[in-house]
């Protein structure tokens, strides 16, 4: 059946219109919609961008069409990340068909598919993880991001290794820590190995702070450190200080691994990961992802509340030395115009496998969420979206 695309109808003509920058959706499911033209979009071109996205839903293994459901992550994730120590240890589930939402000036101008479906966000989870670090920074629980992690917490014996002792919060947040050790049965060298599974093990530990490596093991080490810092489950921290203040639903949930339980100050705490590489991570709807995108668009502010400080957002958007396309996790930057050549250099994306995309265009006051688009097509979607804006 052809997917129905909803290009929204105008709000009531007699409604008093607030200044665009002043509108934010209230808590719950109510979210004001506007016709694309009213918010500066060419409706036909916007529909073309959406049609493109729908036509390019990801299929990780086309050869398996007709054999397995390509949306069943219980099958595709173990195949995608097959390698040493790659068995899933957290929940996986089938995901909804491709869906998305486009926001301008805070209003929904387009929405398609099931944007209320609660699905895995994969590495977009890292954006929520770094937000819990941001709240800790803003509350002076982390005095300086260039302080050593060990100056605050001692999460495991691996953190005490001589190689790991100099590692700072900033390096962990930028994925330049070079942390070595094992997290929940997954050794550092086995995550996204090179041509040979043993390449990184043979090469030895990378220098701290000098190399950028996308590593869920190291991300999970940060999650453990932050759990020790907060002395409570990170989903509770996120809910109290971020998700509830921005009016998110109660449908999202952040899942840990089967074996990621610790006892801290007499409490039994489930430590959550920063992605879905081995299952688990954030399960969330496109609508709630859009709220997080709006928080990013507004530089950490939601109405009269500064949820994440200007200083934290500035750090999040500061390019990382070894990889200028990356800030704090998981702020992918367009500094070199490689991520999205058609967008401005100051635009950003929160990205997760699948692909799960939260695109933020600061100049045009736009947030777009697209879930389950082919990784190689996200830049073209952004080009079509930008082309739909009236000049």
Task: Describe these PLM feature segments.
Residues 19-114, 139-142, 232, 388-391:
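N-terminal leader/targeting segments and the immediately adjacent pre-domain N-terminus
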């Amino acid at each position: 059946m052809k997917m129905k695309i909803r290009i929204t109808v105008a709000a009531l003509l007699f409604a008093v219109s607030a200044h665009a920058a002043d509108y934010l959706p209230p808590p719950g499911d109510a979210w004001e919609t506007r016709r694309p033209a009213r918010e500066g979009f060419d409706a036909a071109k916007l529909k073309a961008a959406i049609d493109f996205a729908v036509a390019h839903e990801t299929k990780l293994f086309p050869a398996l069409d007709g054999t397995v459901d390509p949306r069943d992550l219980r099958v595709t994730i173990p195949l995608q990340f097959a390698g040493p120590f790659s068995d899933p240890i957290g929940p996986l589930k089938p995901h909804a068909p491709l869906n998305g939402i486009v926001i301008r000036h805070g209003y929904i101008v387009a929405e398609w598919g099931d944007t209320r479906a609660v699905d895995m966000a994969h590495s977009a989870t890292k954006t929520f993880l770094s937000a819990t670090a941001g709240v800790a920074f803003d509350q002076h629980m982390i005095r300086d991001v260039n302080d050593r992690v060990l100056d605050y917490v001692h999460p495991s014996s691996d953190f005490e290794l001589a190689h790991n002792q100099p590692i700072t919060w900033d390096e962990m947040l930028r994925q330049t820590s070079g942390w070595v050790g094992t997290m929940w049965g997954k050794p550092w060298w086995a995550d996204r190995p090179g041509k040979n599974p043993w390449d990184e093990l043979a090469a030895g530990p990378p220098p701290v702070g000098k190399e950028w490596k996308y590593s869920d093991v190291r991300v999970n080490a940060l999650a453990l450190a932050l759990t020790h810092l907060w002395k409570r489950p990170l989903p509770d921290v996120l809910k109290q200080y971020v998700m509830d203040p921005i009016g998110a639903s109660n449908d999202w949930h952040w899942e840990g691994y089967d074996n990621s339980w610790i006892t801290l100050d007499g409490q039994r705490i489930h430590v959550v990961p920063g992605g879905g590489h081995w299952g688990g991570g954030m399960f969330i709807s496109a609508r709630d992802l859009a709220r997080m995108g709006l928080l990013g668009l507004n530089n950490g502010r939601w109405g009269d509340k500064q949820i994440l400080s200007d200083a934290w957002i500035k750090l999040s958007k500061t390019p990382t030395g070894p990889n200028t396309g990356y800030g704090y996790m998981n702020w992918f930057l367009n500094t070199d115009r490689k991520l999205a050549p058609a967008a401005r250099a100051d635009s950003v994306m929160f990205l997760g496998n699948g692909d799960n995309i939260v695109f933020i265009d600061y100049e045009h006051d736009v947030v777009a969420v697209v879930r389950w688009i082919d990784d190689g097509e996200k830049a073209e979607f952004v080009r079509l979206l930008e082309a739909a804006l009236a000049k």
